[in-house]
């Protein structure tokens, strides 16, 4: 073999010249045990709480939650069956972050912000941390702008303002999700306008629901033309508990993008009971001590830090807002259970839906007595305040009297009148699903009820009366609605017009 010294020296010189002194140092650990979506990892001495870690062999990510003396408890965002004992785990030195921005509108994503709707990769997005601190006291402003749901019983009696947190609570199958979908659909006319300060973007977070249910919700939003200004974040029942735990924070980060950029958004968490169950599962598997109903001690903080991020910002911070509509499912109407009482104490009011009312045909099945909005009439336009003030009182008196009237045989005329008016107002507050009313139409319809124009109509004909009234108002009497919408109050000349129209309409109404 012929050795050429010149050639060898050339090779050595070129290798020395291209030698890179920087070593690629990665802090890694090893999986000790894995199961139920939790991995115990040895090593990772400097890992941060809440840091994203990687399982390179499985192509999965996880989050370090328990930092103990001899190991780290990691929750896995994905199928833990792909991870084996002894696998390498690497630090990423990043806290969990997700994509945010306008590019998400019209899309369905998972709890990590990955698109799952088959419409290709996301565009026009930036990334932000999932867990951020809620705005302090100084950047906030009192809630004063209405967030119209399009439901008469909510907008008149339990008004919601932009930046408020209003709980939707009730047993299964009482129409909680329908209230939220109606609210989203009701924003369509506003969002078709050009005034960015009035638009309201919608985010729906599905936690622990069936995939078929989520698909049905997306289909409804698409059919109603509401998907173009909505984002759906889905962590379904088949997803691991860590994904169900993370999804509400992911949705909230997406909503905060609009809030912090002088825009308005509403986010619905459907539902937080399932998030609490997922968090309980994770905590017990991480060997954290259980508390009441086996929930961990920090389950209140789990929800409070999420809901405190909904806020109305002051003018110096862009005057944007994020409104939260958390949903809680009760068991047999028990609102005094642990999670319901927690969330009731965090939120600014609740819409309480009852099974009994639902089966009586009163839908939306809102229990007006137990439901409350702690923001109140400051979240209503003047026109609604003018007509809604008396309906609250009349319904309260009706409920009180109806309880006693069961035992009394002969009632005086004033009591009979009160009961008749209350029964008609209850009928008037009924509304079919996915038919939200604009606020000016609600005002006109409620005006007819509280001013006594329904008193001569049989109770079972009130719904038909309202249907015809709405058709007439939207047709020949459109100028009345336009006046209420533009003035944002019922002026004396508008009231006179409305009264004369209603008098003629009641006279001509034949069953």
UniProtKB/Swiss-Prot annotation:
Ion transport keyword on record: yes
Keywords: ATP synthesis, ATP-binding, Cell inner membrane, Cell membrane, CF(1), Hydrogen ion transport, Ion transport, Membrane, Nucleotide-binding, Translocase, Transport
Intrachain S-S bonds: none
Topology of this chain in the membrane: Peripheral membrane protein
Alphabetical list of SUPFAM superfamilies matching this protein: C-terminal domain of alpha and beta subunits of F1 ATP synthase, N-terminal domain of alpha and beta subunits of F1 ATP synthase, P-loop containing nucleoside triphosphate hydrolases
Presence of keyword Endoplasmic reticulum: no
Enzyme Commission designation: 7.1.2.2
Coiled-coil intervals, chain numbering: none
Domain of life: Bacteria
Residues annotated for ATP binding in this entry: 170-177
Class of enzymatic activity (EC top level): translocase
Subcellular location field: Cell inner membrane
Family annotation (CDD domains): ATP-synt_F1_alpha_C, ATP-synt_F1_alpha_N, F1-ATPase_alpha_CD
GO cellular component: a single term: proton-transporting ATP synthase complex
UniProt site positions, description: Required for activity: 371
UniProt-recorded Gene Ontology molecular function terms: ADP binding; ATP binding; proton-transporting ATP synthase activity, rotational mechanism
Catalysed reactions, semicolon-separated: ATP + H2O + 4 H(+)(in) = ADP + phosphate + 5 H(+)(out)
Family: Belongs to the ATPase alpha/beta chains family.
Function, in words: Produces ATP from ADP in the presence of a proton gradient across the membrane. The alpha chain is a regulatory subunit.
Quaternary assembly: F-type ATPases have 2 components, CF(1) - the catalytic core - and CF(0) - the membrane proton channel. CF(1) has five subunits: alpha(3), beta(3), gamma(1), delta(1), epsilon(1). CF(0) has three main subunits: a(1), b(2) and c(9-12). The alpha and beta chains form an alternating ring which encloses part of the gamma chain. CF(1) is attached to CF(0) by a central stalk formed by the gamma and epsilon chains, while a peripheral stalk is formed by the delta and b chains.
Protein name: ATP synthase subunit alpha
Species per Swiss-Prot/TrEMBL record: Granulibacter bethesdensis (strain ATCC BAA-1260 / CGDNIH1)
Lineage of producing organism: Bacteria, Pseudomonadati, Pseudomonadota, Alphaproteobacteria, Acetobacterales
